[in-house]
């Protein structure tokens, strides 16, 4: 099943639509990682919200790239400062050894990267790896957005959305390849 995700926009957020079949959605070039065979369990947005409310001992791990985390991230989240998702396997090797026995809830924008990221962490010996079902955007949709700081970068013309899923004051400069808050 492929979940249908909807958000509304007053402008056309995509310049074009292109449908094609790809071997991997998020390319890592690692054939030993197959989310159909191994992936972390899901935590719903409401469950993550409750973990924050109850001050549970959980490590919240951001699997997104550094330019995305500059726009916003969860309260007390571990930001791996990734240049690209391909850096993720090396980045988790730098995490403290005690994290391997802690509960980790990872997240990304829509949940796709976490399918692979959770498999990578489980293969690397992390014992309790979970992923935020539907990603940050589903968290915004199903909670009041509390515990999120800033906005969420999206991969379309809107650039970033707030916790109410409204377009925010960011533009993307295609000359310097930077996000600019206006």
Task: Give the location of each predicted region.
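Short active-site oxyanion
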Residues: 56-60, 76, 103, 128
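Conserved small/polar residues in nucleotide/adenosyl-binding loops
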Residues: 180-182
């Amino acid at each position: 099943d492929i979940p249908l995700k909807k958000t509304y926009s007053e402008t056309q957020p995509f310049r074009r639509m292109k449908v094609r079949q790809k071997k991997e959605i998020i390319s890592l070039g690692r054939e030993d990682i197959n989310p159909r065979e191994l992936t972390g369990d899901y935590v719903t947005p409401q469950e993550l919200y409750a973990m924050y409310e109850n001050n549970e001992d959980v490590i919240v791990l951001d699997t997104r790239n550094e330019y995305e985390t500059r726009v916003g991230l969860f309260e007390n989240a571990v930001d791996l400062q990734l240049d690209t998702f391909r850096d993720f396997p090396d980045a988790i090797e730098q995490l403290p050894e005690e994290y391997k026995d802690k509960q980790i809830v990872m997240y990304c924008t829509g949940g796709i990267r976490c399918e692979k990221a959770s498999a990578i962490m489980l293969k690397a010996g992390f014992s309790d790896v979970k992923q935020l079902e539907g990603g940050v955007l589903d968290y915004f949709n199903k909670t009041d957005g509390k515990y999120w700081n800033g906005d969420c970068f999206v991969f379309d013309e809107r650039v970033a959305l707030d916790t109410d899923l409204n377009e925010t004051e960011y533009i993307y400069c295609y000359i310097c390849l930077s996000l600019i808050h206006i």
